[in-house]
A protein has these predicted regions:
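Flexible phosphate-sensing "switch/lid" loops adjacent to ATP/NTP-binding sites
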Residues: 1-329
Length: 329
């Protein structure tokens, strides 16, 4: 499901693996025909994040950079359009040796090639690949097919993590697991079984719900990770550690931690909590309004830069939005 925090969950998972002494890189696979995000409306798509080599991509790439303390490149981003463009260019250059080039297997094979290439370039122990969109969408089926093929090729080196939302309807007051059950069944129909489920919700996951997800989704209770809303996103890696997410990941790959370097991240979160003296900062922009809603996603990196600068000075930033179009009139 879009907008539930898959990007932050990916970045946070990478952070806890970094804290264990492993090298990590991250990729985003967007299910758009657009070759990159440069032509997309920021109100609809959110911020267009630009990598150091000029690639215009999804805002989640910014979260990866901030959490992993790394500079990512065009090799860390792909769209359906970009993958198709690459395959067609290879066909024109006769790189397929006269074969009939088909959607399957050639498109998923190009996706897999890009994932492995990102690992080689970063010399990474872990490559975290976020597949955008929602399970069941026809747009991301080729990325799911690539995941299936990769897991079939290297079952001991591939893990599938499902980020699923568990709603708590106000009129009922009870957390519902049905959307997660259906998401897993849709994955099963694509030949995939999640190894871990990150259960997103407004409140922590309780034991009865964990057991229910375990039974209906064919997964160990220990691999159902509670991922409730946090006061600020940089708290999420610490929440994942409390849920022993890194332990479950390393167990899957039969690895042991190299280090325990969580102190620096704890210090960051402590500084954020202690930054209480407010400072007002205005941001002038035009990509705010979408129907009846006011969104700030178009300026995500600006917002995060302001927050980090304020926290460094032990201040709590209070951001005010100034619509440039109103002042132009």
């Amino acid at each position: 499901m879009s907008g539930i925090g898959k990007g932050v969950a990916t970045a946070s998972s990478g952070r806890i693996l970094l804290n264990k002494g492993f090298t990590v890189t991250a990729m985003k696979a967007d299910p758009y025909i657009n070759v990159d995000a440069g032509t997309m409306n920021p109100i609809e798509h959110g911020e267009v994040f630009v990598t150091e080599d000029g690639m215009e991509c999804d805002q989640d790439m910014g979260n990866y950079e901030r959490f992993l303390n790394a500079s990512l490149t065009k090799d860390n981003y792909m769209t359906t359009g970009l993958v198709y463009q690459t395959v067609i260019a290879k066909e024109r250059n006769l790189e397929y040796g006269g074969k009939c080039v088909e959607v399957v297997p050639h498109i998923p094979e190009e996706v897999i090639r890009r994932i492995k290439n990102a690992a080689l370039i970063a010399k990474a122990d872990f490559v975290l690949v976020e597949i955008g969109g929602t399970v069941g969408d026809y747009q991301n089926m080729l990325f799911l097919e690539a995941a299936r093929m990769l897991k079939l090729q290297e079952p001991s080196r591939v893990m599938l993590v499902l980020v699923s939302y568990l709603p708590v309807p106000k009129m009922v007051g009870e957390m519902k697991t049905k959307p997660t059950q259906h998401a897993v069944r849709l994955l099963n129909s694509a030949g995939l079984q999640p190894d871990i489920i990150l259960a997103r919700s407004i409140v922590p996951l309780d034991e009865p719900r964990k057991r229910k997800i375990s039974v209906f989704c064919n997964i160990s209770e220990k691999d159902v990770i509670s991922a409730p809303d946090a006061k600020f996103i940089y708290q999420i890696p610490l929440n994942f550690e409390k849920e022993k997410l890194s332990e479950r990941i390393l167990r899957k790959f039969r690895l042991k931690p190299k280090t325990e370097a969580v102190g620096e991240w704890e210090a960051l979160c402590l500084r954020i909590v202690r930054s209480k003296k407010p400072v007002k900062i205005g941001i002038v922009g035009k990509y705010f309004e979408t129907g009846s809603f006011i969104l700030s996603d178009a300026y995500l990196s600006v917002i995060e830069a302001i927050k980090h600068a304020a926290w460094h000075l032990k201040r709590k930033p209070i951001i005010h939005w100034l619509n440039a179009e109103e002042y132009e009139r």
